[in-house]
Swiss-Prot record:
ATP binds at D177, E178, V179, G180, L181, G182, K183, T184. Residues 490-662 form the Helicase C-terminal domain. One of its GO terms (molecular function) is ATP binding. Keywords: Activator, ATP-binding, DNA-binding, Helicase, Hydrolase, Nucleotide-binding, Transcription, Transcription regulation. The gene is rapA. This is RNA polymerase-associated protein RapA. InterPro entries: Helicase_ATP-bd (IPR014001), Helicase_C-like (IPR001650), Helicase_RapA (IPR023949), P-loop_NTPase (IPR027417), RapA_C (IPR022737), SNF2-like_sf (IPR038718), SNF2/RAD54-like_C (IPR049730), SNF2_N (IPR000330).
Length: 968
């Protein structure tokens, strides 16, 4: 190579050194100084891995003083280059810049510049980059984006609600499904969609203190959303980092008590510019027109500042009309401002719901019902549809469905309220109770007697709580190490049950973590029973491991011993046997326990075993739950109401279980209340609202479509290729699981989402649902999205060179493969990717500009090519640089037509869809006041901004590959 002092070269292997200067040359070696790092490199002259940096007319270059110029002419004298052109800052023409004064921090970003500078990538990286562009573009266009990536079962009614609400601008809705139907999952799906699409960036979740960790776990494990938990300590720490502590995190969970306890804290929350507010257990916010509670006022204040609000609450029938109105008032105070008016409106919807029930049942409608439907829908040309619906023709069924859809659009609160019931959703198992009455040991009898004497001054409630857990009373007197399990008949029964059901997975729940730990030791030491423990003292990772061990079919734990708090938010529906070693204090906790197994997707009837000690509070409570509330074998929406109404009497019976006079009457009264309330709830069911919330056949089709997308083999092939190139080790564990661990040769030292210890992944939804320590990989998983971002945001794979062995073509024939990207720049919240995601356009040009891409498919062509090492590649590029420049100009001339066609198609699609949505809502606004003005304004503004952004769309060269034909 001819080297001259002052020439500028770039290292082929260490491009991060920047532009080097030749500072010494002798017969065998050359020394380069790299000013940007201050380092020297000594190379052999004969075969050094460096490339001469030469710019061409039209290029923009930067001087070491920082000014830029457009090159118009290049002169060479004694091996040194001088660039002549126009300065961009002063517009002075004829400026000369010698190459020695070029900026040393030079970075080649354009693919062609990287190619000509010898920065040649491996061939497989070019292929990965193109696939990443292609798949990324396709995923943005896929229907149901944002609904495919969560680790949940594909349950139609949940998907229906999430699909409807998740696409709205700043949704403000009430999620009021019955217990066990997945309100938390619905909220998570909505958040996931909004965050993924860019419609929301900052989210605040407010929950009761006891549910904070449940939400934290659910959001992380199911949706890969990493929330920060704010309590007093975290809030105080964050005050050192920002004026508003809540500005330090994008996704925050805090308790309602934490939010309302301090005026300054509430002000900080209101000022933090959240996009979405989620409030769980919203039915506990007490409201009346005269005296709203402090908790209600705190949420009301927040709801005024946050555009999107999701309230999770009990069903409207459980709440009562006034309480239900109070929730709706938080969502839209302008619409729901008068309780009396609201009551009147609700009465008016009853005949509509009845008519819908008749439509669905296929019954003929009377003239009065037809007239009422016509008035309710309010369309001028509705008469033919009504007649068709009431006829015996083949079109009758579709006409009835269309009428139901129109009614749902216009129905009072159907846009702000979603409510599913177990009656309306299929797929729940039966629950069968098995009570085991056991004698009270003398040791407990003595301890209870002494406790009664010593605790005479305790309140009835405290005594009742003590009496539920006799082993704790015994330990109070004998010490924490007292071996109560040696004589407690529940332990003997449990061991006998487990040894006779070795093949069954059994979930055992008890109130206290200490009880769970002691039981595990006894089961292991006495019977060799494999038991995992799960309690609040364990970290999330430790709980995951315990849950995963329990989930393993052959070598896993037979038993999972859970404490009350530790099991919150975890579902184990692969098991169907539950043992309640003791009983919880209220019916909500009882339902929460059973809810660990009683979920949609449970394949077997649930066997609930309750071993209880006679003459204790347990014997009182088991009868009250079963005979008074029927709470074991059926969900009990009336439980809390009845519990509150008989609380004092119940406490007294629990505190003094030997005094049972009148207890039978209490049970009888509770059962009567339960039946009456249940009938009242059933009567108050709103069938129209249920149909809207459930989604019917449309929701079923949605679930089936996502299930089909789960089988995308392209994802697996792409992910493995991506992990290989990033440098992530992959170890097949079997059972559709792979362990990923970082290697020493990764593209980046710390890859987001991959810990030092590694992670276990699966592409199988069922495996992910059964094993909580396994991450479910989809196109929406952060690991894939971070990988795509790593490849596409940098220059990985943007320039390469390959050899094509083909004797049908002359040796030395050149082909240039160009990957252009057509894109538009816009704020993320406009969700422009729905219409024009960054879209690759592939061209394969010969020296005459003939585009062969349509005839030569990428993957087929890629398999015919051979790699070239970087050093040889640099020599080839230098030899054909002028020819490549000419082909690039031909490509630039051709891309405009293809790009314009894509942009025009995107404009037409955006205009059609956004205008249609606006027109639909404007028409409905006349008959349904629940369509908010700000929603209409936002859609119109969004449409205008989208169209303006698409008008500014352009294209750029993203990657290129030089192909040289050889016969060897």
């Amino acid at each position: 190579m001819p080297f001259t002092l002052g020439q500028r070269w770039i290292s082929d292997t260490e491009s991060e050194l920047g532009l080097g200067t030749v500072v010494a040359v002798d017969a065998r070696t050359v020394t380069l100084l790299f000013p940007s790092t201050g380092e020297n490199r000594l190379y052999a002259r004969s075969d050094s891995p460096v490339t001469r940096v030469m710019f061409n007319p039209g290029d923009t270059i930067t001087s070491h003083d920082g000014w830029q110029m457009q090159v118009e002419e290049v002169k060479e004298e004694n091996g040194l280059l001088t660039y002549i052109g126009t300065r961009l800052d002063t517009e002075e023409s004829g400026v000369a810049l010698r190459e020695v004064f070029l900026d040393s921090k030079l970075v080649f970003s354009k693919p062609q510049d990287r190619l000509f500078a010898g920065q040649i990538d491996r061939m497989d990286r070019f292929a990965l980059r193109y696939r990443a562009r292609k798949y990324s573009s396709e995923q943005f266009r896929m229907p149901y984006s944002g609904l495919r990536g969560q680790r949940t079962s594909l349950i139609p009614h949940q998907l229906n609600i999430a699909h409807d609400v998740g696409r709205r601008h700043a949704p403000r809705v009430l999620l009021a499904d019955e217990v066990g139907l997945g309100k938390t999952i619905e909220a998570g799906m909505i958040l996931h969609q909004q965050l993924l699409s860019g419609a929301a960036e900052r989210v605040l979740i407010i929950v009761p203190e006891t549910l904070q960790h449940q939400w934290l776990v659910e959001m992380l494990r199911r949706f890969n959303l990493r929330f920060a938990l704010f309590d007093d300590e975290r809030y105080a720490e964050a005050q050192h980092d920002a004026y508003n502590p809540f500005d330090t995190e994008q996704l925050v969970i805090c308790s309602l008590d934490f939010a309302r306890r301090s005026k300054q804290r509430l002000e900080h929350l209101c000022e933090a510019e959240w996009d979405l507010l989620v409030v769980d257990e919203a039915h506990h916010l007490v409201w009346s027109e005269d005296a709203p509670s402090r908790e209600y006022q705190a949420i009301e204040q927040l709801a005024e500042h946050v555009p999107g609000v999701l309230l999770l609450t009990a069903t409207p029938e459980q709440l009562g009309m006034e309480s239900h109105f109070a929730r709706l008032r938080l969502l839209d105070p302008n619409r729901f401002h008068d309780f009396a008016q609201f009551v009147e409106e609700q009465k008016n919807y009853r005949p509509v719901a009845d008519a819908v029930a008749m439509l669905l049942a296929g019954n003929k409608l009377s003239n009065d019902e037809l007239n009422m439907l016509g008035e309710m829908i309010g369309e001028q040309d509705i008469e033919p549809l009504l007649q068709a619906a009431n006829s015996d023709s083949e079109d009758a069924q579709s006409a009835r469905q269309e009428l139901v859809s129109m009614l749902m659009d216009r129905h009072g609160t159907s846009r702000v309220l979603f409510r599913n019931t177990r009656n309306g959703v299929k797929g729940f198992p039966k629950r069968e109770l098995h009570t085991i009455k056991l004698p009270l040991p003398t040791q407990y009898q003595t301890a209870i007697k002494v406790s009664g004497i010593m605790g005479a001054r305790k309140s009835a409630e405290d005594r009742a709580r003590d009496m539920l857990y006799p082993e704790r009373i015994y330990q109070e007197f004998e010490g924490d190490n007292a071996t109560w399990w040696n004589f407690d008949p529940r332990v003997e029964w449990l061991m006998g049950y487990l040894t006779s059901h070795r093949s069954q997975k059994v979930l055992v729940i008890c109130a206290k973590a200490a009880t769970a730990l002691q039981l595990e030791q006894v089961l292991r030491e006495r019977e060799g029973i494999r038991a995992a423990v799960f309690h609040e003292g364990m970290s999330i990772i430790e709980r995951d491991r315990a849950a995963a061990w329990f989930a393993e079919e052959d070598t896993g734990a037979q038993v999972l011993l859970c404490s009350e708090i530790g099991s919150e938010g975890r579902n184990f529906q692969f098991a169907s046997h539950m043992v309640m070693f003791d009983l919880p204090f209220n019916p909500d906790l009882l339902e929460q326990r059973i809810g660990r197994l009683d979920r949609i997707g449970q394949a077997h009837d649930i066997q609930i075993h309750v071993p209880y000690l006679e003459k204790t509070a347990q014997s009182v409570l088991v009868r009250w739950y079963h005979e008074g509330l029927d709470a074991f074998e059926h969900t009990c929406p009336t439980g809390r109401t009845i519990y509150d109404s008989v609380y004092n009497d119940l406490i007294n019976y629990l505190a003094s279980p030997d005094q049972t006079e009148g207890f039978d009457d209490l049970i009888k009264n509770c059962r009567e209340q339960h039946e009456a309330l249940k009938a009242q709830l059933e009567q108050g069911r709103d069938r129209l609202l249920e149909i809207h919330s459930n989604g019917g056949e449309k929701a079923q089709a949605l679930a089936e479509s996502i299930e089909e997308q789960d089988d995308d083999t392209n994802l697996i092939a792409f992910a493995m290729n991506l992990f290989d190139i990033i440098g992530i080790n992959q170890d097949d564990r079997g059972d559709n699981m792979i362990v990923l661990t970082p290697s020493d040769h990764m593209l980046v030292p710390d890859f987001p989402g991959l810990s030092e210890d590694g992670i276990t992944i699966t592409f199988d939804r069922e495996v992910a649902l059964a094993r909580e320590d396994t991450q479910f990989i989809t196109w929406e998983h952060p690991l894939i999205r971070n990988g795509l971002d790593l490849i596409l945001s940098g220059d990985t794979g943007s320039s390469t060179i390959s050899l094509l062995k083909n004797k049908a073509l002359p040796v030395g024939t050149l082909l240039v493969e160009l990957i252009y990207v057509v894109e538009a720049q816009a704020p993320k919240q406009l969700q422009l990717n729905r219409f024009l995601p960054p879209t690759p356009v592939r061209m394969l040009l010969d020296k005459n500009g003939n585009n062969l891409a349509a005839q030569v498919e990428f993957e087929t062509f890629n398999r015919q090519l051979n790699a070239v090492n970087r050093h040889t590649g640099s020599k080839l590029v230098n030899a054909v640089q002028q020819d490549v420049h000419a082909i690039l100009q031909l490509g630039e001339a051709q891309i405009e037509k293809s790009a314009r066609a894509l942009i025009d198609a995107a404009r037409n699609e955006a205009d059609e869809k956004l205008s249609a949505e606006l027109s639909r809502l404007e028409a409905l606004r006349a008959v349904n006041p629940n369509i908010r003005d700000d929603e209409l304004t936002a859609i119109e503004s969004n449409r205008q901004q989208v169209m303006e952004s698409l008008d500014q769309a352009g294209w750029r060269l993203d990657a290129l590959r030089l192909i040289v034909v050889t016969h060897q």
